[in-house]
Amino acid sequence: KNEKILPLSIKKKVIWAGPYTASREFLSRWSIFGEHESVETIEEVLQKKQIEAECITGCNILSDAECKVWQVEQELSDKPRDEQWLETITQEDTVVCVLGEHESQSGEAASRAFLTLPEEQQVLFEKIAERTRNIVTVVIAGRPLDLRRISEKSKAVIMAWRPGTMGAEAIVDIVYGRINPSGKLSVSIPWCVGQVPISYWDVKTGHILTEDNSENRFTSRYMDIPNTPLYPFGYGLSYTEFDISDIDVQIGQDKKVHVHCNVCNTGNVAGAEVVQCYYETL
C-alpha cells in the first residue's frame, strides 16, 4: 500500500518506532547457522547512511506472557521506553513503524490461531495512530498476518517478511527511495483470519458469487466479510508505472504455450516489473 507518502525525503522529519528498529532478529527459523551479530539494525543503518531520524523502540517484540507461550527469553531493550515521546508527535509528523512477529512465531512447530501482531506492538501502533495519520508500517513476519487494522491506519505498508542479514539496509533504501521495490506477494494476505486458508487457485463450483448476483444470499460467500483477500497473491507496488502491451499467445509444435509481450516503464523512476501470467480451465 502506498498513498503517495513513499518514498520519504531525507530532509523530512521522520520518527522510526517499534522494537524492530533496534533488533537484529531479521533471520528466519530455518537459518540454523545464521549469526545475529552480523545483522545490522535499522538504527545502525540510518546512522551509517547519515540519515537524521529519531529511533524509538517503544516496546518489546513480545510481552512477558507471550514469551512464556512461545518459550523464548525476553529480549529487553537497552533503550529507554519513556512514553513521553508519544506526546511530542503531531499530525504533521511522519512515523515509520517497524513491527512484526517474533522469529519463534513462524517456522516449524509454531502454529497460530490468531494472526495479529503481538499485544504490546498493537498497543504501540494504536497510540501512534491516535497522534498522526502519516504512518508507514514495515511488517516483519514469516507468514501472512491479519493486517487489516494496520492497513486502515497506515498510509503505506511494506511487507518485508524476514529479510535476512541485509534486511535493515534494504528497508531503509526502499523507504527513502534509494531502490525501487518490485516484489510481488507469493501468498494472499487474508482480510481476516476467518478466510484462512485462502488461495488464488481455489476452484469455485456451484452458486458462484458474481457481479450479477451480488445481492443473492444463496451464493458461495461470507455474509459479514468480503470473499477477496486484503492483498491478493501477486500484488505489489512500485515507485513507477509499467505498461504491458502487444501480448501474443501461441501454442508451439512442442505443445507448450509461448507468451510474448512488451513491457514499457512509463514513469520517471528506474524499476523492474514482474510479468504474471495466469490460466484457468473453463
Enumerate the predicted regions with their spans.
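Secreted, periplasmic, or luminal enzymes acting at the cell surface/secretory milieu
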Residues: K1-E43, Q47-K49, I56, L62-V69, ...
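Glycine/threonine-rich flexible loop motifs
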Residues: E25-S28, L99-E119
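Alpha-helical scaffolding segments of alpha/beta enzyme cores, especially the outer helices
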Residues: T41, Q84-E87, E120-E130, I244
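A short helix->loop->beta-strand "cap" motif at the edges of active sites that frequently abuts
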Residues: I51, E130-I135, K153-K155
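Charged, often glycine-rich, active-site loop that binds/positions anionic groups
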Residues: D64-P80
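An anion/phosphate-binding loop that grips the pyrophosphate of nucleotide cofactors and donors
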Residues: E92
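Extended, hydrophobic alpha-helical segments in both membrane/secreted and soluble proteins
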Residues: Q121-F125, I135, V157, I171
